[in-house]
Amino acid sequence: MTEATGIVGEFLTLKEGTDADLLAMQCGDFYEFFAEDAEIVADELDLKVSQKSSHGSSYPMAGVPVDDLTPYVSALVERGYRVAIADQHETENGHAREITRVVTPGTHLETGDESAQYLAAVVREASRDSGDTYGIAATDVTTGQFQVTQLDDADAGEALTELYTFGPAEILPGPELRNDDEFLDRLRERTDAALTLHDSASFEPGRASHTVREQFGSETVDSVGIGDQNVAVRAAGAVLSYVEDTGVGTLAAVTRLQAYGERDHVDLDATTQRNLELTETMQGDSSGSLFDTIDHTVTAAGGRLLQQWLQRPRRNRAELQRRQSCVAALSEAAMARERIRETLSDAYDLERLAARATSGSADARDLRAVQETLALLGQVADAVTETERLAESPLADALDGADREAADSLAAELDSALVADPPGTVRQGGLFKRGHDDDLDEIIDEHEAALEWLETLPDREKERTGITHLSVDRNKTDGYYIQVGKSETDAVPEKYQHIKTLKNSKRYTTPELDEKERDVLRLEERRHDMEYEHFQRLRARVAEHATLLQDVGRTLAELDAFASLAVHAVENDWARPAVVDGNELSIEAGRHPVVEQTTEFVPNDLYMDDDRQFLIVTGPNMSGKSTYMRQAALITLLAQVGSFVPARSATVGLVDGIFTRVGALDELAQGRSTFMVEMQELSNILHSATEESLVILDEVGRGTATFDGISIAWAATEYIVNSIQSKTLFATHYHELTALGEELPTVENVHVAVDGEPRSAGSDGDVTFLRTVRDGPTDRSYGVHVADLAGVPEPVVDRSQAVLDRLRDDKAIEIRGSEQNDGGTTQAVFDLDSGQFRDGAAQSGGAAAGSTAEPVATDGDPEHAPGEAAAEGPKGDERAASLDSETEAVLSELTELDVNETPPVELMAKVQEWQAELDDE
Ligand code: ADP
Ligand code: MG
């Protein structure tokens, strides 16, 4: 068949011209996939493959009916494919087909998912002096949101964090990032986004700037301050051009350019978001996350907003107080709150409806949903004004954010146009009420009259003919007909013309019926066309109001989010925290917001300020150290969301960032060594945290040998205390670190108290702990203590203690303070053996020195450290005398080997080699 050749050929040509993964090409009433595409689609979607022959070869073919395309495409896109759609249209000489739309993960309008769906672009430029500048733009085509930011002098980590926070479905890397494998790898580690190489030209500054100004207007671009942010503009331009190219048709709904800077938000890196389990648990479940726990929103948009708040806590005190006041008012006005939530639960997703109206995919039911939701604004506004507690709160202002008059008038317009319960298809009439348009009314009247005539025809005919089994119906082949039961066919009047005989009946028509049929068909077609035209006009009216819809949608979403926070606060007895400037963090009877849901939680206090900047948290395993620290981080975070917090009372000094290093179990799965990851994260914290940050370190150093670990933990503590000065909580099982708490002025020890007489939890003999946090360090040998409590035999416990003492033998560490604070570098020297301080530069020498054996090394006098000398062992020449030449050789190789420069595998090989050499003797 030559026609077949044509179709497959055309398919392959179109496919060549697109970089989409799959092509669906319209062929009459079907969309067809051919060749390889057919096989992929059939596999993914369980479609049947048939064969299409062309040029003597045969091609696999799979198709879906035109009306069913959307769900199939959605399913493919959700599996990560980019699907091009070629529509067919009539031309003078037959059909022509062209690609009208490419549906991609980031431009997928018919998503079944309520959460935000971001398409992001990221670009990088090397800046003159130091570091790089990253520009990121992200849009959600389903809601018209558009956000841009520029990160100056940033390392890739900050850009990756931004992208992680958006969780985009699709990312367009700029031309300069496409070959940066390291960046791309790290990107893939953090997101599941599809990476798409969009036309490089659209990233060019001139072109991008033009695109952005066209979209938002030059004034807007300048007023939000991205006009001179070249890098941000490049990302924004690329995103807009991609949305345009894919043909999703929602650009008109993208009306608001939101530019945000680094100073607006609390810095939360990807690790911290994961560690604090903000939106999903470490295991990757959304249930059990902070969001899942506190989310009581009743609308999809409200849920999206609340989630966004959690991921982007704020630093602006006025904004936080505004939010708190709204939550406070709603938590007190219980009746009004429930009335508002009840009302909101009828709301549809206005932001998404705006995008559907703009893209031309909204049907009459969607416009009805718009109308019904717009009408809710008035209802909730009434609930606010009628309730004194709410009326005097900032909620009243929040509601003014949306133009109520415009909303009412659009709602009224839609209400007077559309019938109450319109059909799901827009091409078959029945959409409009009478009175919408005179000409339309006339056609509707005529049409209905004709239908009425047909409807009453059976009764008239029965009466006239006396036939009882008579009906009038319609089908595709016969048109309208009169059907008479077999037993009564003898009685039919003469003018009945027989058209068909069935088993139990005969069908007839009459000249009159034929004429009415022609009328009805003509009127029907006319009516459908007219209604469709009017509908398109009405939909365009709604699209013109996209901004209004978004405003109202966001106002309702905000109200929903506030009400949700209020519900959670009331139900869980949370308190409104004081948000203040400065470094205070005080929490009275604080709880962990997620753990308190499932456990009888033992509340704890926390106090930190300038003089108590760094807390070392000690206590046995499973005593609650990690929980206590996360609780501090989550309470700070919630306070900076504007929420109430799980505590009797709290004062939270606003932070610029929260950094955590908690647990390591999940990282093993990624094939990176736990310790490497631990150190990378520590490194990131030490680079990024400032004196306004909150840092949570949980068991840092645990991933390596004990003394290695202590050393790193020790040095990191000194560095944070002396150089960074962030508010820090450090849980450690290295009891040695508590020495720092006793010596450095801003470092304090707290411990989770272990009950002397352990309470037995039930009959299984589990040891339970008190979990109360108190000042001071924990019992130094709690590990052994726990072994004892758990009933390990006495000889083992005793021996453990002895071994521990031996291990700590003869070790001493000096403690460093900062120059300006302490007038000297060395603060004290801690003897790990005795658990006592020896001498130190800043210590008042005499008494302390007298109580211990000898003075040990300080910074000022490193050469003559007696400890070191002792550790060196026998002097060189003595050693030479007692060693054979092989051993000498091994030793000298060992001395020369640069451990840091030698790959671990080589190191192992070396060690084996040496062992073999030494064995030979
Ligand atoms: P650690 O870090 O000291 O090993 P965790 O913080 O992991 O201990 O806590 C151990 C267990 O105790 C967890 O199951 C946690 O839910 C529970 N827990 C911790 N703190 C409390 C508390 N204050 N009240 C009740 N249960 C707690
Ligand atoms: Mg822990």
UniProtKB/Swiss-Prot annotation:
The family database entries (HAMAP family) matched by this protein are listed as: MutS
Q: Which InterPro entries match?
A: DNA_mismatch_repair_MutS (IPR005748), DNA_mismatch_repair_MutS-lik_N (IPR007695), DNA_mismatch_repair_MutS/MSH (IPR017261), DNA_mismatch_repair_MutS_C (IPR000432), DNA_mismatch_repair_MutS_clamp (IPR007861), DNA_mismatch_repair_MutS_core (IPR007696), DNA_mismatch_repair_MutS_N (IPR016151), DNA_mismatch_repair_MutS_sf (IPR036187)
User: Any idea what job this protein has?
Assistant: This protein is involved in the repair of mismatches in DNA. It is possible that it carries out the mismatch recognition step. This protein has a weak ATPase activity.
Do you know which NCBIfam families this protein is assigned to?
mutS1 (TIGR01070), PRK05399.1 (NF003810)
Q: What is this protein called?
A: DNA mismatch repair protein MutS 1
Any one GO MF annotation of this record: ATP binding
Membership in a protein family: Belongs to the DNA mismatch repair MutS family.
* Record keyword DNA repair present: yes
Question: Which region ranges are annotated with the description Disordered?
Answer: 837-887
Q: Which residues bind ATP?
A: G619, P620, N621, M622, S623, G624, K625, S626
Q: Which GO terms describe its biological process?
A: mismatch repair
Q: Which PANTHER family match?
A: DNA MISMATCH REPAIR PROTEIN MSH1, MITOCHONDRIAL, DNA MISMATCH REPAIR PROTEIN MUTS FAMILY MEMBER
Q: Which domain of life is it from?
A: Archaea
Taking the record's annotation, the residue ranges forming a coiled coil are none
Recorded source organism is Haloarcula marismortui (strain ATCC 43049 / DSM 3752 / JCM 8966 / VKM B-1809)
Keywords from the named record = ATP-binding, DNA damage, DNA repair, DNA-binding, Nucleotide-binding
Compositionally biased residues, Low complexity: 840-853
